Curated annotation (Swiss-Prot):
Gene3D superfamilies, alphabetized: Ribosomal protein S11
NCBIfam families, alphabetized: PRK05309.1, uS11_bact
Organism: Legionella pneumophila subsp. pneumophila (strain Philadelphia 1 / ATCC 33152 / DSM 7513)
One Gene Ontology term from the biological process aspect of the record: translation
GO cellular component: ribonucleoprotein complex; ribosome
Taxonomic lineage: Bacteria, Pseudomonadati, Pseudomonadota, Gammaproteobacteria, Legionellales
Quaternary context: Part of the 30S ribosomal subunit. Interacts with proteins S7 and S18. Binds to IF-3.
Family classification: Belongs to the universal ribosomal protein uS11 family.
Protein name: Small ribosomal subunit protein uS11
Signal peptide extent: none
GO terms assigned for molecular function: rRNA binding; structural constituent of ribosome
Function (record text): Located on the platform of the 30S subunit, it bridges several disparate RNA helices of the 16S rRNA. Forms part of the Shine-Dalgarno cleft in the 70S ribosome.
InterPro entries: Ribosomal_uS11 (IPR001971), Ribosomal_uS11_bac-type (IPR019981), Ribosomal_uS11_sf (IPR036967)
Length: 132
């Protein structure tokens, strides 16, 4: 006779790290804005995008959509206990300034703001001019 043991699932409660200071990476392209909160080592804690916040098409590339995405990511970052951030802005998109403004509104202490947009040393040919 086989004796059946009742297997009990051992579930451990996930311990959330406390990260008091971190980095905010803002990738602002012409079509979308991606906001990522990381710790000092660069490990991603949370992120949000304009498209993931419910905006589609041309509304996705507006400063308001970037503001809403920042609001969503900041709410999760506050659960980690984040208070002060360094901001790295990448790209020429319309969500650059509104994202930083929203971080100030969310009561984050901004330690530094750095623009890390890549500058081509005569790299790729730019797209042709629009004829409207």
């Amino acid at each position: 006779m086989a004796i059946t043991k009742s297997k009990q699932q051992k579930t451990r409660k996930k311990v959330k790290r406390v990260v008091s200071d971190g980095i905010v990476h803002i990738h602002a392209s012409f079509n979308n804005t991606i906001v990522t909160f990381t710790d000092r080592q660069g490990n991603a804690l949370c992120w949000a995008t304009s498209g993931g916040s419910g905006f589609r098409g041309s509304r996705k590339s507006t400063p308001y959509a970037a503001q809403v995405a920042t609001e969503r990511a900041a709410a999760v970052a506050k659960e980690y206990g984040m208070k002060s951030v360094a901001v790295f802005v990448h790209g020429p998109g319309p969500g650059r300034e509104s994202t930083i403004r929203e971080l100030i509104t969310q009561d984050f202490k901004i330690v530094e703001i750095t623009d890390v947009t890549g500058i081509p040393h005569n790299g790729c040919k730019p797209p042709k001019k629009r004829r409207v």
